[in-house]
Amino acid sequence: MIRKDAKRSALVLFSGGQDSATCLAWALERYETVETLGFDYGQRHRVELECREGFRNAVARAFPAWAERLGDDHMIDLSVLGAISDTAMTREIEIEATANGLPNTFVPGRNLMFMTIAAAIAYRRGLQVLVGGMCETDFSGYPDCRDDTMKALQVALNLGMDTRVLLETPLMWLDKGDTWRLAHQLGGDELVELVRVETHTCYVGERAELHAWGFGCGECPACRLRKRGYEAYLSGEKVTEAPV
C-alpha cells in the first residue's frame, strides 16, 4: 500500500529510464501535484531523453487519476557536465572498470548537481518533495547513489536554501526485480508494460530490438541488470548477484 500525501507536491528527476519512470508512478500515486525534471548533460545518446515525453503521455492516457496530478515538465541544459566529464556516459568509449573499482559509467558529481538544480527549481515552484531513482543495490557502487549521500545532501540543501525540502528515494533498498514489482504494485500489468516498452536503459542507446524486458543491446551492464531484474520479477526471486 502506497501512503498518499495529498498535501504535498513533488518534483521527480525523470530521465526516461526504468527507475525514474517507476519513481514517477510512485509519486503520482502519492502526491497532489507532480512535475518532472530532465537533464541534457551531453550523454553519448539522446534515446533515453526522447522516451520522456512518450512515457508521460502514455501514463496520462492509461491512468486518468494520475493525469490530473501530472504537472509541468522541465528540461535543463547541463552540457557543462558532459564537457568536464571523461566517462563512458559522455564519450564513445568502451564500458569497463576503473582503477578505483567504479565502472567508467560513473559521472562524478552528476546526482549532486541534479539534486541541487532540482532543489532550486522546487524552491521557485513551491514544491516540497524531490524524488530520485537512486539506489544502493544495482551493483554499480556509484557513491552519489548512496543513502548517506542523499541524506547529507538533504541537510545541505535545506541549510543552504533555508527551506525544508524532502528528498525521497523509493528505490534505495530495492533490487531490480523489486523495482519491477513496485511498478506492478502501483499500476498492474499495464504499468509494467509501459515501463517495458516506453522506457530506455541501454548505455549504448540501442532501440532496434524489443526483448522480453524491453529495448536494448542486451550486452551492456544496464541491459544485463534490467534483464536479470525482469526475470527475477517473473520468477519471484531476488537479484542477489551481479548479472553476467
Curated annotation (Swiss-Prot):
Pathway: Purine metabolism; 7-cyano-7-deazaguanine biosynthesis. InterPro entries: QueC, Rossmann-like_a/b/a_fold. GO terms for biological process: queuosine biosynthetic process. Its cofactor is Zn(2+). Transmembrane segments: none annotated. ATP binds at F14, S15, G16, G17, Q18, D19, S20, A21, T22, C23, L24. Zn(2+) binds at C202, C217, C220, C223. Belongs to the QueC family. Catalyzes the ATP-dependent conversion of 7-carboxy-7-deazaguanine (CDG) to 7-cyano-7-deazaguanine (preQ(0)). HAMAP family: QueC (MF_01633). NCBIfam families: 7-cyano-7-deazaguanine synthase QueC. This is 7-cyano-7-deazaguanine synthase. The lineage of its organism: Bacteria, Pseudomonadati, Pseudomonadota, Betaproteobacteria, Burkholderiales.
